[in-house]
Amino acid sequence: MDPCDCAKTGACNCGATCKCTNCQCTTCKKSCCSCCPSGCSKCASGCVCKGNSCGSSCCQ
């Protein structure tokens, strides 16, 4: 997992093909920038955020 600056820039680049925008993640994960909203301590396995939103079932 590569660190990213979503919290600062709202965007990160995970490898050559994956980009995450309008996101509040603090780390990029292998599953193309899965991330948690700032109110979530962690995301459930397989959770993928679209934009800066994430289903409540993702948040743990």
From Swiss-Prot:
Alphabetized GO MF terms: metal ion binding
Sequence segments annotated as region (Alpha): 29-60
Residues annotated as binding a divalent metal cation 5: 33, 35-36, 49
Similarity-based family: Belongs to the metallothionein superfamily. Type 1 family.
Source species taxonomy: Eukaryota, Metazoa, Chordata, Craniata, Vertebrata
Binding site for a divalent metal cation 7: 49, 54, 58-59
Gene3D superfamilies in the record: Metallothionein Isoform II
Protein name in UniProt: Metallothionein
UniProt binding sites for a divalent metal cation 4: 32-33, 43, 47
Binding site for a divalent metal cation 6: 36, 40, 43, 59
UniProt xrefs under InterPro entries: Metalthion_dom_sf, Metalthion_dom_sf_vert, Metalthion_vert, Metalthion_vert_metal_BS
UniProt region (Beta), positions on chain: 1-28
Keyword entries, A-Z: Metal-binding, Metal-thiolate cluster
Annotated residues for binding of a divalent metal cation 2: 6, 12, 14, 25
Positions annotated to bind a divalent metal cation 1: 4, 6, 20, 23
